[in-house]
Amino acid sequence: MSGDNSSSLTPGFFILNGVPGLEATHIWISLPFCFMYIIAVVGNCGLICLISHEEALHRPMYYFLALLSFTDVTLCTTMVPNMLCIFWFNLKEIDFNACLAQMFFVHMLTGMESGVLMLMALDRYVAICYPLRYATILTNPVIAKAGLATFLRNVMLIIPFTLLTKRLPYCRGNFIPHTYCDHMSVAKVSCGNFKVNAIYGLMVALLIGVFDICCISVSYTMILQAVMSLSSADARHKAFSTCTSHMCSIVITYVAAFFTFFTHRFVGHNIPNHIHIIVANLYLLLPPTMNPIVYGVKTKQIQEGVIKFLLGDKVSFTYDK
């Protein structure tokens, strides 16, 4: 087997084949992915710079947005440059340990994105249900601790992915029909029993997804009750409009995630493998691409921040929570 050493069934490297069955069209497939990646990097880095530069945006909501942007740009950067090397230069080899590292960061950052969306829902809950205590509840230390706790949660849950994958013997070859090192795609290359990998992967996906979605659902239930109790229609519209960008991000992220998750596990045999691979890439690229667009279009404070950033002190705005 290519990549074997004499004393172990662990390969020295894997071969990422890209999109199986569509090798002849790799160049054309790469174009929309490259375009989306550029938008994601420019948009999210722009948001981070804007929030760090504009003192008026130094509020909990925008700190969480900056954390989401950092997570998004890091997530797509872990897989898109390598994918483009496969598509453009036919550089398909990836070192075994590099593959495990990519696997860890892809899954950890995916969980991190879900966790940050959950924190943003809690932020909106505090802002709308406890507006007078908003600044005293969500202080900078609290925000930092919440972000750190979310990060550590995902690190601790995803580390076993690499350990479980590393223990498997690889005697069937080292060719992976994918554009990046996904946990189960790598495990299925092995000639060992990867049932533990499958069970643990399902458990982690459900644990992170169910917990975060429950927190988001409870937060928005309380928000809806608080908004509906307001006497003024204008006040209800103003309060709920602060949540629209976040709700759009939730829909984009979780619809893509659940589509990938359920089609892969329950109707996978009825869907061609190349469709799975393309959807898996879109699942990782679509939220980072769309989030800065959604927040730029839907959030008045971001629009005003961009204008002020470009024009300097010539204009001034009043920012709400």
Curated annotation (Swiss-Prot):
A GO molecular-function descriptor: G protein-coupled receptor activity
The species this protein was found in: Homo sapiens
Lineage: Eukaryota, Metazoa, Chordata, Craniata, Vertebrata
Cytoplasmic topological domain: 49-56, 123-141, 220-239, 298-321
Glycosylated residues in this chain: 5
Function, in words: Odorant receptor.
Membrane topology (UniProt): Multi-pass membrane protein
Name of the protein in question: Olfactory receptor 52N2
Extracellular side: 1-27, 78-101, 163-198, 261-276
